């Protein structure tokens, strides 16, 4: 086994494997181990299942340690092949379905690809999410100020504080139409809320970041530039935070938060509907 890896972890599904990955990562994050992740989506036939089993077994025979296997598979014949492997296998969906089946006194009707696949029942939701992504891309970094009234949230902040990835995550994960507007160095001499944003103040949300972190990020983009200097970063952050306070714009410091955490905080603070797809 690689000395830097404590366990090999498989995420296996007859669909996208997103559910297996999300739940598996959540579980593994509770343990102080270094993992090597292997995601195998669309394991839909016995031939592919046997190849996956062989891959699991090969790692076991190579390392002497059972790989951990998080799986979500509908067809019993495919599950049976995976369960014959040398891995420690956990059915992440059935672990929850079984007690719910007993509580609700209902039999489940498992269908492959139901969670992240397209069906007549979720097509409208899917179209709405794609429309949100299109809107967010068209309104990234102040590219367009048209139709800003259609935004559900407008993120503000200095360059490289996390506006774009947060906007895209909100659109892709939750179907939120998120615009974002940058404050640049030229704005700092007389930083005011742009006239186009004043009527939409109830949709504004600010991001800030520690100047030291901002300087490090900018240094990777423009080495040894005024743009990346700590002095410039301190000045810009101070000016923008003063603007937030003056205009009573809610804001958070993104320095120690992941994109997922930032987006979730925005949804909570702004009272936006959290839609899952």
Curated annotation (Swiss-Prot):
Gene Ontology MF terms in the entry: ADP binding; ATP binding; DNA binding; phosphotransferase activity, phosphate group as acceptor; protein serine/threonine kinase activity
Pfam families: Kinase-PPPase
Signal peptide bounds: none
Catalytic activity: [pyruvate, water dikinase] + ADP = [pyruvate, water dikinase]-phosphate + AMP + H(+); [pyruvate, water dikinase]-phosphate + phosphate + H(+) = [pyruvate, water dikinase] + diphosphate
InterPro entries reported in the protein's UniProt record: Kinase-pyrophosphorylase (IPR005177), PSRP (IPR026530), TF_DNA-bd_sf (IPR008917)
Top-level taxon: Bacteria
Name of the top EC class for this enzyme: transferase
A GO BP entry: regulation of DNA-templated transcription
EC numbers on record: 2.7.11.33, 2.7.4.28
Binding locations of ADP: 157-164
Keywords: Kinase, Nucleotide-binding, Serine/threonine-protein kinase, Transferase
Role: Bifunctional serine/threonine kinase and phosphorylase involved in the regulation of the phosphoenolpyruvate synthase (PEPS) by catalyzing its phosphorylation/dephosphorylation.
HAMAP family, per database record: PSRP
Family classification: Belongs to the pyruvate, phosphate/water dikinase regulatory protein family. PSRP subfamily.
Name used for this protein in its record: Phosphoenolpyruvate synthase regulatory protein
Organism for this UniProt entry: Escherichia fergusonii (strain ATCC 35469 / DSM 13698 / CCUG 18766 / IAM 14443 / JCM 21226 / LMG 7866 / NBRC 102419 / NCTC 12128 / CDC 0568-73)
Gene: ppsR
């Amino acid at each position: 086994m690689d000395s830097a890896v404590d366990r090999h972890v498989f995420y296996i599904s007859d669909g996208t494997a997103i559910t297996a990955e999300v739940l598996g990562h959540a579980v593994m994050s509770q343990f102080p181990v270094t993992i090597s992740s292997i995601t195998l989506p669309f394991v839909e036939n016995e031939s592919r299942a046997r190849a996956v089993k062989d891959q699991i077994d090969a790692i076991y025979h190579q390392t002497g340690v059972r790989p951990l296997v998080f799986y979500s598979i509908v067809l019993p014949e495919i599950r049976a092949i995976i369960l014959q492997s040398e891995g420690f296998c956990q059915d992440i969906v059935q672990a929850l379905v079984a007690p719910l089946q007993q509580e609700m006194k209902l039999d489940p009707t498992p269908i492959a690809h139901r969670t992240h696949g397209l069906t007549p029942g979720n097509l409208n939701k899917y179209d709405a999410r794609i429309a949100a992504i299109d809107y967010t891309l068209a309104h990234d970094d102040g590219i367009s100020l048209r139709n800003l009234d259609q935004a559900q949230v407008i993120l503000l902040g200095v360059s490289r504080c996390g506006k774009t990835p947060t906007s895209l995550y909100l659109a892709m994960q939750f179907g939120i139409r998120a615009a974002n507007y940058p404050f640049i160095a030229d704005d700092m001499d007389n930083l005011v809320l742009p006239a186009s944003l004043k009527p939409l103040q109830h949709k504004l949300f600010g991001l800030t970041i520690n100047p030291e972190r901002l300087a490090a990020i900018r240094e990777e983009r423009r080495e040894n530039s005024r743009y990346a200097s700590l002095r410039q970063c301190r000045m810009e952050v101070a000016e923008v935070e003063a603007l937030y306070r003056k205009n009573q714009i809610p804001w958070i410091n993104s320095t120690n938060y992941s994109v997922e955490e930032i987006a979730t905080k925005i949804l909570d603070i702004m009272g936006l509907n959290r839609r899952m797809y």
